[in-house]
Amino acid sequence: MTTRKDSELEGVTLLGNQGTNYLFDYSPEVLESFPNKHENRDYFVKFNCPEFTSLCPKTGQPDFATIYISYIPDKKMVESKSLKLYLFSFRNHGDFHEDCMNIIMNDLIELMDPRYIEVWGKFTPRGGISIDPYTNYGKPGTKYEKMAEYRMMNHDLYPETIDNR
């Protein structure tokens, strides 16, 4: 039994679709959303994405990361299969780690207009260095803007011990 009406699921076309088309080039248009039925309260939604890949824009070598996407929804939420396909579309996309995290956050803001969102990429080392870009956003003029500032200043005060991931 579902509590969702068909009208609430009109924009959700990928979930349950057996003929999924896997795109290998950056494709933000694959993202889909659905209505948040609990917009009267704040709550976090967190996605752990351990299989993210993109390409170095200079060398074309593959980069691998676990990405953490956390957000407080407002009126819309991202549909998880569309998010999976969207992240998969970075496979042949050449950009620096920092750029990829900001692109992902910007696309999700455009899709959902969340109250708050953060995207944190933990990339595996290449050349003996791992890069962990973190970006966040709080809706301007709200308490979430202050929350974003606070979390930015305190997000990695006690970093984990790097054990070659």
Swiss-Prot record:
Active site: 56, 63
GO molecular function, one term: preQ1 synthase activity
Localization annotation: Cytoplasm
Primary location class: cytoplasm
UniProt cross-references to Gene3D superfamilies, sorted A to Z: 3.30.1130.10
UniProt KW Oxidoreductase keyword: yes
Catalytic activity: 7-aminomethyl-7-carbaguanine + 2 NADP(+) = 7-cyano-7-deazaguanine + 2 NADPH + 3 H(+)
Iron is among the record's keywords: no
Pfam families linked: QueF
Any one biological process term the GO annotation gives: queuosine biosynthetic process
EC number(s) per entry: 1.7.1.13
Principal EC category: oxidoreductase
GO CC list: cytoplasm
Binding, substrate: 78-80, 97-98
Keywords: Cytoplasm, NADP, Oxidoreductase, Queuosine biosynthesis
Pathway: tRNA modification; tRNA-queuosine biosynthesis
Function: Catalyzes the NADPH-dependent reduction of 7-cyano-7-deazaguanine (preQ0) to 7-aminomethyl-7-deazaguanine (preQ1).
Family of this protein: Belongs to the GTP cyclohydrolase I family. QueF type 1 subfamily.
Annotated protein name in UniProt: NADPH-dependent 7-cyano-7-deazaguanine reductase
